[in-house]
Amino acid sequence: MEVGEVILTTQQLKQVLTIEPDNQEVYKLFNKLNNPFVVGAPVPPDRFVGRKSLIETAFDQIYNRSNLAIWGGPGMGKTSFLELLASPDVWQEYGEEPSQAVMVLFSCESIQPFTASGFWQEVLIELMDKLDSEPDLKSDIETLLDQGKATARGMRQVLGQLGKRNKFLVLLVDDYDAALRENPHYTQADIEVFLSECRSIAYQSREREYLSMIVTSLKRFNELGPSLTPDQSPWYNHYLFVVLRPLTETEVDTLLQGIPITPALRDVIQNMAGGHPALLQIAGSLLFRELRTGKLPDTETFAKEFESQTRHIFQDIWQRCRDVEQGLLILMAWSKLKGSLEQKITVDLSDIDLVFSQQELDLYSLEQQGLIMRNQDLEKPVYLFRSSIMEQWVIHKIQTSDKASLEKWETILLKLINP
């Protein structure tokens, strides 16, 4: 049921209860109308909004048995997107035939501690659960697992068997960052071997025609994983890279359609959420909760509640930024900071525009992460925070910093000024 339909049905049931307050059947129906916005969990495929071009790109890659790497910051909808691609209904909606595809979806974070053998074991176990119609192949996979052959070589054997049955594997891997981090059981050398094996299967082996691999990460791969050397091909060059950007205004309108909000409240949501999918789900959930009680919150009350509900997201975003990115965010907020910090931070920041002109790549990275936007209507680019709360969070973070933290920010800012 669409958001607008849920709200309309809620209003109709409330009218009935006004006339018949003892009608228990209507009361039960009223309580069953769940909030259509999803907070703290992936958005189900039937409530997924937008990303049409990216969905089409993903199906193009699957059709060609090629590979896709999707990256985006916290809450940008990576897991929701993978779950969408795993839905047979979505395949049919986009004119694709799901019967030959065996779809396996899991998160690398579920493998603790992450190891290459743990990865292949997880793939084979999940694959086995999808092969009830192929008992012989299911038995072969079980034998591989029992014999401790959950390896890249074993995976190639299974892909070959899938191909003989006119099937192929769509491997949807969330949180691929975990495969690029060392741990006590997974060394840098192990990482390099694992990535080489993945590239070999997906790009070089005969069995590649029975596999399409789609992975997600918080950052683009060239910022993660092993460094490249002149004598090696990039370990990630078999992927097409796409970034999950904030939702467009049209997509935001679609998400919030049917909610009778004032233009002022709509502007507050746009200003505070900035098109960020997780923030918009929280905003929609808060609004729906209030509407179900028969009232619409005023902008000030809504803003306070929204800020309280989203503080952890902004903290997560900040902590995941590199030092140079944090420094650039501080510079963007400097006009509102300098009055209270000019005695504490003594770095000469009189020519911030020059710093920005020298840091275009890192600013572009922040732009792609959906944290800032560039206004190019003026003679020179002007960078703005996408979310007013993110700007407030940066300001508060610096204003409440102790001496050691302020010295750290000074060092970062000096490096930006003198690259």
Label every PLM stretch briefly:
Residues 25-49, 53-54, 136-140, 234-237:
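Conserved adenine-nucleotide phosphate-binding loops and their immediately adjacent elements
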Residues 239-265, 283:
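Conserved small helical "lid"/interfacial subdomain of P-loop NTPases
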